[in-house]
């Protein structure tokens, strides 16, 4: 499905994020990833990206590193508000709250784009019911 870019933020020389519109029927679990690509005249190049936004948010958000010679990231880092992005129709993944055992504490350690699924999870108020 095609979504429109609503916001782009360059955090530093190596990391940026972007938000897109979200089809009201698009469902995912916090911590899931989906395929992202850019429209073109040929078959689009798609890559897996963790969803940074929580499943209750009205937009989709993604983190990406900047790779100058990357087949997709070299183009994604030049996104502007209003550009179109292809988003896979399905999401998947195992780093989801349903797979986390309840306990006293929840530790989530990551850097860079590895933060994306964790940010999706910590924005979910229900995750805090599983931990003290």
Where do the model's predicted regions map?
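FNR/FR-type flavoprotein reductase catalytic core
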Residues: 71-132
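Ferredoxin-reductase
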Residues: 1-81
């Amino acid at each position: 499905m095609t979504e429109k870019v609503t916001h782009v933020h360059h955090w530093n020389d190596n990391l940026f994020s972007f938000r897109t519109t979200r089809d009201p029927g698009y469902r995912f679990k916090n911590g899931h990833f989906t395929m992202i690509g850019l429209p073109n005249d040929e078959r689009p190049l798609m890559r897996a990206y963790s969803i940074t936004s929580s499943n209750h948010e009205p937009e989709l958000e993604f983190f990406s590193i900047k790779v100058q010679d990357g087949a997709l990231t070299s183009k994604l880092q030049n996104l502007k508000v209003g550009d179109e992005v292809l988003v896979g129709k399905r999401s998947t993944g195992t780093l989801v709250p349903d797979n986390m055992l309840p306990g006293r504490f929840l530790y989530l350690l990551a850097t860079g784009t590895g933060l994306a699924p964790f940010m999706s999870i910590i924005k979910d108020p229900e995750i805090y019911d599983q931990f003290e």
